[in-house]
Amino acid sequence: MEELIDKIKERVKEREKESDVMANGYFYDFRKNVFKGKMDEKYISMFLEGDGSELVSKACAPHSSSMLGYNFFHWINKEHKLTITFNDKKEITYNEVLFEVKIPVLNGKKEANMDIVLRNNKTGEWLFIESKFTEYLNRGKFKMSDSYRNESLYFKKDYRDKWTRIIDSISGSSKETGYWDGIKQEICHLIGLTNWLDKCVEIKGKEYNNEDVRFIILVLEPDEERFKNEYDKFTDYKKLYYSFYE
C-alpha cells in the first residue's frame, strides 16, 4: 500500500481493540467509520441506496472518499449552515446536504453517483461535489465504454457527437498512465448534469429550475515533506485535471 494509506491505517489500528475495527484497519460496518458520534439514519439510507454492497464495502475503508465526504459535511442543516465564497466572488450559503445522489447519464444504463450535494432549499442553489481522497494514486489508461458512442442512449441525439468529440480528443492525448478514471468520472457527471440542466431528467425528484448550479472536485492534498511520492502523484493529477478543461 502507499505510504499515506498505511499511515491512515496505523491510526485506525489503534482502535483494533474495539470490536468495530478489523485487523487490516477496515471497519466491520461503514456506520462506524465516522469521526465522532453516530451516523444519522437518514444518511445511512442514502448510502444504502447508492451502489449497494459495492459502495458499502468501500465505505468500510478508512481512506474511503465517500466517508471522507460524510465526515466533512454531515453537520450541515438549517441550524448549521455552510457559506462558501467562490472564485467569481459570489457568496452562497447551503443549509442541506445529500450523499450518494444518483444522476441519470445514459438512457437505460447505470446512473452515476455524486458523492455530495449541498443545497439551499430556500433559495435554490446547488453544489455538486465529487470527493477524492487517495484515488489519484491509482494509475491506468483512459477508456470509456462503447455505450457512449450509441446515439440512442443519449437523452438528446445531438449530445452524442458533442461528447464523443471530447472523449476522442482525450483518448488521443492519453498515452501515458495517470489517474484517468477520475477524468472518466468527470465526463459521466458532466453528461448527467447536462441532462438535468436541459430538463431531460430529474435529480432527487426535482427538475432544474434556473437555480445557481456548481460542480467541484474535492481532493486531499498530501503534505509534500511527509508524503513526497503521494504529493508528486497529486500534482500529476492536478495537471491532468486542468488539461481536461483547456
Q: What are these model-derived regions, one by one?
A:
Residues M1-P104:
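Nuclease-adjacent, charged terminal/linker segments that flank catalytic cores
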Residues A61-G69, K109, G178-C188:
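Phosphate/oxyanion-binding active-site loops and adjacent basic polyanion-contact surfaces
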Residues K102-N107, K132-Y136, W196-D198, L220-E224:
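Short, solvent-exposed loop/turn segments at secondary-structure junctions
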Residues I116-N120, E125-E135, H189:
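Conserved catalytic cores of phosphodiester-cleaving nucleases, focusing on short active-site segments
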Residues N138-R214:
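Acidic, metal/cofactor-coordinating or nucleic-acid-engaging core segments within structured domains
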Residues V213-E221:
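Extended hydrophobic secondary-structure segments that form protein cores and membrane-embedded regions
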Residues F227-E246:
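Polybasic (Lys/Arg-rich)
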